[in-house]
C-alpha cells in the first residue's frame, strides 16, 4: 500500500521491501546450498604414502625345480570372489557362487594349473566349506572341518573315490587387508577385530592343525590389497564422523602383517620345522612388490574397486604356478 515519505511524497518502497528481502534470502540460501554441495562433491586425493622400504626375506625354494610335477596332484582352492576371478578363463562373467568358468578379470589360473598336471577343485560361497574365509575363521574351519576339506571335490561334495586333496590353497578376500589397528594380542584366538596382533594369533593357531597332516601341502595366499582411490569430500567427512575404518592407515598395517607371514627368519613359519606349509604373497605382488601399500591393479571407473583387474590376475598366475611347483617338491609330494 502506498505511503507518504517525510516530504509528503508518495513512496512504494516500504510495501515492497519485505518481499524483496525474502526473495534475496531464498536465492542466497539456495546458492549457498549449491556451493556447499559442490564443495562436498569435490574429490579428495589421499595423502602421500610413507613407505617402509625394509624388505623381508621370504622362504627360498630355489633349491627345487619349478617344472611341472611328475605326477597328478589334487588341489583344493578355498576362496571367494577374487580367487574365483583369478582361477577363471578370461571372458564374460559366467558362473555362480564365485566359481567361474570365465570372468572379465579372469587370470587363467585354473587353465595354467591344469596344464601343469594339477586337478583343480573349489569351495566358495554357497557351501559350508567355502563359507567364512575371514582371517579369524580359518582356525575353526581347519580344526573342525579338516577331514571334509581334504575330501572336498567341489563345494560340499566329497570325492566319489577314496582319494584326498594333496594341496589345500586358502585365501581371504581384500576386506581382510582393512586393518583397524596394530593392537596388543587379545588371547582369544583372533576374535573379530581385525588388528595385526589378532591376525597373527589366528595364523599361529593353524600350525598345530597343519602339523597333523604332513602328507598335505597347505598354501596360505595373502589377501589382496585395498584400492586407494580418490573419494568425494562428503564420504571422507562421513567416515571420520562415523569412525569408520581409515583406508590410508590400514595400508601400512596390512604390509606389516603380510611381511610377518612371509618373513622366513622372524615371521609366521620361522619356528615351523615341517615342510608342508608355504605362503604365496599375493598382497605384495599386487602392490608392485612394495611400490605402494595399496593395490596397483584395482578395478572400477576410478580405481575404487579392490578386486584385482585382469592384468593383476595374469601376473599372479605367472608367479604362482612355478612357486607351487617348487613348494610341492619341497613338501615331498613329487620328485
Predicted regions and their residues:
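N-terminal export leaders
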Residues: 23-27
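Catalytic His-Asp segment of secreted/periplasmic serine-dependent ester chemistry enzymes
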Residues: 227-335
Amino acid at each position: 500500500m502506498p505511503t507518504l515519505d517525510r516530504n509528503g511524497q508518495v513512496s512504494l518502497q516500504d510495501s515492497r521491501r519485505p518481499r524483496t528481502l525474502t526473495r534475496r534470502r531464498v536465492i542466497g540460501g539456495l546458492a549457498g546450498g549449491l556451493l556447499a554441495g559442490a564443495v562436498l562433491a569435490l574429490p579428495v586425493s589421499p595423502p602421500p604414502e610413507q613407505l617402509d622400504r625394509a624388505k623381508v626375506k621370504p622362504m627360498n625354494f630355489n633349491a627345487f625345480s619349478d617344472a611341472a610335477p611328475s605326477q597328478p596332484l589334487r588341489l583344493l582352492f578355498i576362496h571367494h570372489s577374487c580367487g574365483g576371478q583369478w582361477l577363471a578363463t578370461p571372458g564374460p562373467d559366467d558362473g555362480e557362487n564365485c566359481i567361474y568358468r570365465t570372468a572379465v578379470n579372469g587370470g587363467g589360473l585354473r587353465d595354467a594349473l591344469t596344464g601343469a598336471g594339477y586337478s583343480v577343485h573349489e569351495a566358495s560361497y554357497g557351501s559350508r566349506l567355502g563359507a567364512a574365509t575371514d582371517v579369524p575363521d580359518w582356525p575353526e574351519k581347519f580344526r573342525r572341518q579338516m577331514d571334509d576339506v581334504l575330501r572336498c571335490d567341489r563345494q560340499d561334495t566329497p570325492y566319489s573315490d577314496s582319494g584326498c586333496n594333496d594341496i589345500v590353497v586358502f585365501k581371504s578376500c581384500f576386506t581382510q587387508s582393512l586393518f583397524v589397528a596394530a593392537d596388543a594380542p587379545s588371547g582369544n584366538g583372533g576374535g573379530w577385530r581385525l588388528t595385526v596382533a589378532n591376525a597373527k594369533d589366528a595364523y599361529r593357531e593353524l600350525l598345530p592343525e597343519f602339523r597333523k597332516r604332513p602328507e598335505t601341502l597347505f598354501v596360505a595366499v595373502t589377501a589382496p590389497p585395498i584400492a586407494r582411490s580418490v573419494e568425494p569430500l562428503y564420504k571422507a567427512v562421513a567416515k571420520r564422523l562415523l569412525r569408520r575404518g581409515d583406508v590410508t592407515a590400514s595400508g601400512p598395517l596390512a604390509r606389516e602383517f603380510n611381511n610377518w607371514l612371509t618373513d622366513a627368519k622372524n615371521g609366521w613359519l620361522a619356528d615351523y620345522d615341517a615342510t608342508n606349509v608355504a605362503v604365496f604373497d599375493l598382497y605384495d605382488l599386487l602392490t608392485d612388490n612394495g611400490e605402494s601399500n595399496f593395490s596397483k591393479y584395482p578395478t572400477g571407473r576410478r580405481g575404487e574397486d579392490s578386486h584385482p583387474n585382469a592384468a593383476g590376475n595374469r601376473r599372479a598366475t605367472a608367479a604362482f604356478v612355478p612357486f607351487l611347483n617348487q613348494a610341492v617338491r619341497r613338501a615331498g609330494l613329487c620328485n
